[in-house]
């Protein structure tokens, strides 16, 4: 086994991983205003999460996750990026 070679896998290419995207400041403000909440009230995702790293999310960002659903077509959820 070679210690110098590492296998890199892109989890976003897996069919079960939904689309993740970092919202702009304007988009984040609009969503928070619509929901009537503060960013910290959203479910959290750590900046060290493989998908958060892949999309370049930093603590304080909000990630939009778009999932396909057999019952409701498409579901959009949001995550607040925390350190760690």
Swiss-Prot record:
The keyword Transcription applies. InterPro entries: Arch_Rpo5/euc_Rpb5, RNA_pol_subH/Rpb5_C, RNA_pol_subH/Rpb5_CS, RPB5-like_sf. Gene3D superfamilies: RPB5-like RNA polymerase subunit. One of its GO terms (molecular function) is DNA binding. Its EC number is 2.7.7.6. Keywords: Cytoplasm, DNA-directed RNA polymerase, Nucleotidyltransferase, Transcription, Transferase. The keyword Nucleotidyltransferase applies. It is found in: Cytoplasm. It is an enzyme of class 2 (transferase). One of its GO terms (cellular component) is DNA-directed RNA polymerase complex. GO terms for biological process: transcription by RNA polymerase II; transcription elongation by RNA polymerase I; tRNA transcription by RNA polymerase III. It catalyses: RNA(n) + a ribonucleoside 5'-triphosphate = RNA(n+1) + diphosphate. DNA-dependent RNA polymerase (RNAP) catalyzes the transcription of DNA into RNA using the four ribonucleoside triphosphates as substrates. Belongs to the archaeal Rpo5/eukaryotic RPB5 RNA polymerase subunit family. Part of the RNA polymerase complex. NCBIfam families: PRK09570.1. PANTHER family: DNA-DIRECTED RNA POLYMERASES I, II, AND III SUBUNIT RPABC1. This is DNA-directed RNA polymerase subunit Rpo5. It comes from Sulfurisphaera tokodaii (strain DSM 16993 / JCM 10545 / NBRC 100140 / 7). The lineage of its organism: Archaea, Thermoproteota, Thermoprotei, Sulfolobales, Sulfolobaceae.
């Amino acid at each position: 086994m070679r210690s110098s070679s590492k296998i890199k896998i892109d989890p976003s290419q897996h069919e079960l991983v939904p689309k993740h995207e970092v919202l702009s400041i304007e988009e984040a403000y609009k969503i928070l205003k619509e929901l009537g909440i503060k960013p910290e009230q959203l479910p959290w995702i750590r900046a060290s999460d493989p998908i958060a790293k892949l999309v370049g999310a930093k603590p304080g960002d909000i990630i939009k996750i778009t999932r396909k659903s057999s019952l409701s077509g498409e579901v959009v959820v949001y995550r607040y990026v925390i350190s760690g």
